[in-house]
């Protein structure tokens, strides 16, 4: 059977060691003999390339890039969130790591309903504010991936270092970052800390400006010195819980201590002779992807005009 494997890393696709293509480059295929790194930010992608040049494997690179994205892509890549990782080993085995956020123990089925049973909008609801935050899984997820599937050639501290350096020294704000910060203006200006971090002199950072994050650099430095447990049991954990208490959040020290990243068995399906391997629940992506492709198998796409409305309808 021909095989097509789809792998989802935290906003990251990694195969093995290679150059990075600029988004501004012409839309020509990018080829590499030994593999490649791709993410939503070129600076972060180059971190992954450097890791592999130093002897690290794809998992090492994915970890370093994930941490770098916590600096360069705060809209999605961050220490305070979570994600999924798909890994294919050299022997052909595939596995999945689930490090999505978990609900705090104090959360309950009506936590986002007001006294009248209506959904709370804005502050206090499921999307905005301290009560919307889940227990972060990123650090535990990277820890599990490194312990089980890292090359063993690079240490935890070495993989964290590029992100620490980026946060301390700063990086040039991209157009997409400037745009996303401005698009989140309503929420970033609402809280004193986000306003202080993401605004300079009352204005959002602009494309090309240097963006430094000293507090984030200090967090990475603590992770380097004390390891992953620092985030869940040490000074960083205490800072998170104290901020939650000040702002009516739900997360406690017990929630952080109790977080566990899990290794799961990927879901599998078939599409026109290809085997599809993807992320299992709690991600809906893999199951939905396979269902979509199974539906498409009932149609002869080759007979449809490339730009026909029927083809667009089916593919959408």
Question: What role is predicted for each listed range?
Answer:
Residues 298-316:
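Internal maturation/activation junctions in enzymes
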Residues 25-46, 50, 58-59, 63-233, ...:
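Noncatalytic scaffold domains of N-terminal-nucleophile
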Residues 1-6:
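Positively charged n-region of N-terminal signal peptides that target proteins for export
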Residues 7-19:
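Bacterial N-terminal signal peptides
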């Amino acid at each position: 059977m021909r095989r097509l494997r789809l792998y989802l890393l935290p906003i990251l696709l990694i195969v093995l060691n290679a150059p990075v293509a600029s988004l501004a480059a012409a839309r020509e295929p990018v080829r590499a003999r030994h593999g490649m790194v791709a993410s939503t930010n070129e600076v972060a992608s180059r971190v992954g390339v450097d890791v592999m040049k130093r002897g690290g494997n794809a998992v090492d690179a994915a970890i370093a890039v994930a941490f770098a994205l916590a600096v360069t892509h705060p809209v999605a890549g961050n220490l305070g969130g979570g994600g999924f990782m798909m890994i294919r080993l050299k022997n052909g085995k595939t596995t999945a790591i689930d490090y999505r956020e978990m609900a705090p123990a104090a959360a309950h089925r009506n936590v986002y309903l007001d006294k009248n049973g209506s959904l709370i909008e804005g502050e206090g609801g499921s999307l905005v504010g301290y009560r919307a935050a889940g227990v972060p899984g990123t650090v535990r997820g990277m820890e599990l991936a490194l312990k089980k599937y890292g090359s063993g050639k690079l240490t935890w501290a070495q993989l964290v270092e590029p992100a620490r350096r980026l946060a301390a020294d700063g990086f040039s704000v991209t157009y997409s970052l400037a745009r996303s910060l401005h698009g989140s203006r309503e929420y970033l200006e609402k809280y004193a800390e986000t306003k202080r971090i993401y605004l300079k002199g009352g204005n959002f950072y602009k494309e090309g400006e240097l963006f430094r994050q000293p507090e984030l650099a200090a967090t990475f430095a603590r992770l380097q010195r004390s390891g992953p447990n620092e985030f869940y049991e040490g000074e960083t954990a205490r800072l998170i819980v104290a901020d939650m208490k000040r702002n009516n959040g739900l997360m406690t020290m017990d929630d952080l201590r109790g977080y566990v990243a899990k290794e799961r068995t990927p879901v599998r399906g078939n599409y026109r002779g290809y085997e599809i391997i993807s992320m299992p629940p709690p991600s809906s992506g893999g199951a939905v992807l396979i269902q979509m492709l199974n539906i498409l198998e009932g149609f002869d796409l080759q007979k449809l005009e490339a730009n026909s409305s029927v083809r667009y309808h089916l593919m959408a």
